[in-house]
Amino acid sequence: MKLFGLIGEKLGHSLSPEIHNKVFKDNNIDGLYNLFSVKKDFENNIVESLKCLGVRGANVTIPYKEKVMNQLDIISHEAKAIGAVNTILIKDGKSYGYNTDYYGFGKMLERAKVDIEGNSFFVLGAGGAARSILKYLEDSKAKKIVLVSRDKEKVFKKFKDFNINFMSYGELEEIHEEFALINTTPCGMYPNTNSVAVSEKVIKKFKVALDIVYNPLETKFLKMAKDNGLKTVDGLFMLVGQGVKAEEIWNGIKVDKSTEENIYEELKCRF
């Protein structure tokens, strides 16, 4: 049996086991997916511990996505650029790090038929979640990428390696019609379901609204967007997509789209 798992600090309500167990079943993989709750005292021994336990692959979540990087032998191009690893592969005694949030975001857009090349994207929020999204948009030849934050100067230093523009929320109020608006902030996430990062006036200026929040599935941001005629995309398929990509890395397989869809539909019923 192959052993896999999720590494983090507080993992009580993770949906990851359901995603991975479905992939195991559909691909005849004899696998076991565990939750590994790691105290901060042991954060410097994560990869060595995985090797000792015989773990083949692991997902990494808050607060260890950055801290685990210096423990790895090889880090993928996208993970280096993003500055975070959320997937580890242990193979032939070596450890490899990847960022499958990058691919999960791509799968989310592909499924929703949102074209990137030649279009403009405005990203709300400058936390860790924004980095994988900015990198994917950059690599996919978006015409214009704008990072919207409360402190433009501070964020410029943090994201100076990206080929993007910077804007404050006040400046966002003054823009004209653009293509897509992406929420990467926790605004609207349960239990703060009434919060939204921008006004309806701003939302109306876009054609597409995407939210990486998936609980609830339709956030206040997406509801406002839908009511104003925008195409809306929820964040659940990004979660599914990043998990599926991890399985492809760990097991050297190509997961069928029907499996991704079935996982999405099963999880959707939860929210």
Curated annotation (Swiss-Prot):
Shikimate binds at residues 14-16, 61, 86, 101, 214. Keywords: Amino-acid biosynthesis, Aromatic amino acid biosynthesis, NADP, Oxidoreductase. It catalyses: shikimate + NADP(+) = 3-dehydroshikimate + NADPH + H(+). NADP(+) binds at residues 125-129, 212, 235. Pathway: Metabolic intermediate biosynthesis; chorismate biosynthesis; chorismate from D-erythrose 4-phosphate and phosphoenolpyruvate: step 4/7. It comes from the Bacteria. One of its GO terms (molecular function) is shikimate 3-dehydrogenase (NADP+) activity. Its EC number is 1.1.1.25. The active site is at residue 65. GO terms for biological process: amino acid biosynthetic process; aromatic amino acid family biosynthetic process; chorismate biosynthetic process; shikimate metabolic process. InterPro entries: Aminoacid_DH-like_N_sf (IPR046346), NAD(P)-bd_dom_sf (IPR036291), Shikimate_DH (IPR011342), Shikimate_DH-bd_N (IPR013708), Shikimate_DH_fam (IPR022893), Shikm_DH/Glu-tRNA_Rdtase (IPR006151). GO terms for cellular component: cytosol. Pfam families: Shikimate_DH (PF01488), Shikimate_dh_N (PF08501). PANTHER family: BIFUNCTIONAL 3-DEHYDROQUINATE DEHYDRATASE_SHIKIMATE DEHYDROGENASE, CHLOROPLASTIC, SHIKIMATE DEHYDROGENASE. Involved in the biosynthesis of the chorismate, which leads to the biosynthesis of aromatic amino acids. Catalyzes the reversible NADPH linked reduction of 3-dehydroshikimate (DHSA) to yield shikimate (SA). Homodimer. NCBIfam families: aroE. Belongs to the shikimate dehydrogenase family. This is Shikimate dehydrogenase (NADP(+)). It comes from Clostridium perfringens (strain SM101 / Type A).
